[in-house]
Amino acid sequence: MSQNIGKISQVIGAVIDVEFEPGKLPPIYNALRVTNPSIDDKENNLVLEVAQHLGENSVRTIAMDSTDGLVRGQAAIDTGKQISVPVGRKTLGRILNVIGDPVDEMGPVGAEKEYGIHREAPAFVDQSTKVEAFTTGIKVVDLLAPYARGGKIGLFGGAGVGKTVLIMELINNIAMQHGGFSVFAGVGERTREGNDLWMEMKESGVLEKTALVYGQMNEPPGARARVALSALSIAEYFRDEEGQNVLLFIDNIFRFTQAGSEVSALLGRIPSAVGYQPTLATEMGELQERITSTNKGSITSVQAIYVPADDLTDPAPATAFAHLDATTVLSRQIAELGIYPAVDPLDSTSRILDPQVIGEEHYAIARQVQYVLQKYKDLQDIIAILGMDELSEEDKLVVARARKIQRFLSQPFHVAEAFTGAPGKYVELKDTIKGFQEIVAGKHDDVPEQAFYLVGTIEEAIEKAKTLAV
């Protein structure tokens, strides 16, 4: 079969127009290949994805790599299929880019099968409706906003409040305890963090169970807008063909939206609210609906979601909210108190915080903890104006317990050992419930609040109190 070859007619940043002969337009999402000598000396090293048809013989495409050095009239070859990435066990322990090429200098992937990155979401009849929680070993999450197996979890937070550290701790805890496969999509984040994650995974022995797919901050918007889909295709293979329970980590889903908005104006779309692309909800829906549990296996996804200027009503985080089963909101106010993980116990929510799923005891204690913290929040204005002495004895007790709960919600992380000097702690759910139940019941009213800071179980807090008393 003769190749369908077009010619570049216009280059505007990451968007390239290609002309074909009449009747030979490639379909939307098809991959075209062009030789760009400024990337490297290989043939057909630049992939373009067809995004629009312009009239009868021209397409508008998005480039997956640098377009510097391209010229008008250059040949673009239609591959006849969409961007495909290698899938299967050979991808484990490897770092791939958006088009599935390895970037870890460890030779070709050698996978037997490839999946296209644009795939249909599973049909309703194939989706599983079973609801069960899975334990992360992080107290604040397991108690107040538990994660559902096969669910979608969002980590919301502004810049520098600890989203990436929390994701790395989850990868560490879940890979150690859960033993299944993980896929990590680095979408538009810092290359340094991607490198750190790879090194840490190597050291902890988790790497051989994880596939890493990176499209980092320094890459063109085309790569950042598609890399999450590439990672998702790898996860779908493990779910559908091997019946695995896969974990998909995306850091950061906001960059997926941001990359879409960068190319949207160049594609000639009129921007909508706050300058985002008009197709924001559709693009997010196409990605999120593929992340689900089926009768064969499940994909549980944990997504870091950057919140621009700490504004949760911004269209990008607000659109992501609609798809989530649990939200873990990281708060700058809590980070300022030195409490890490800086999870807001009152803003974080979970669909499965329900006595029928997690049991009556867990539910009751979670609600009591939230009640005490909410009461403390309500009293803070009075304390700020009049001081603690003006409170009733009952309110003073509530404040003392709330401050202990607040500190007990902190926890030393394995991945932060280098910074804190404290060994990381994985806390079993039963120990978490027991600890908070004892604080709320007033068993530890005589223990100083510092004893609860950065410990694992309640027993450790009591031991720490003994050393403080000396």
Curated annotation (Swiss-Prot):
Membrane topology field: Peripheral membrane protein
Free-text function comment from the UniProt entry: Produces ATP from ADP in the presence of a proton gradient across the membrane. The catalytic sites are hosted primarily by the beta subunits.
Cross-referenced Pfam families, in alphabetical order? ATP-synt_ab, ATP-synt_ab_N, ATP-synt_VA_C
Q: What broad class of enzyme is this?
A: translocase
The answer to whether the entry has keyword Cell inner membrane is yes
* The protein's name: ATP synthase subunit beta
Question: Where can this protein be found?
Answer: Cell inner membrane
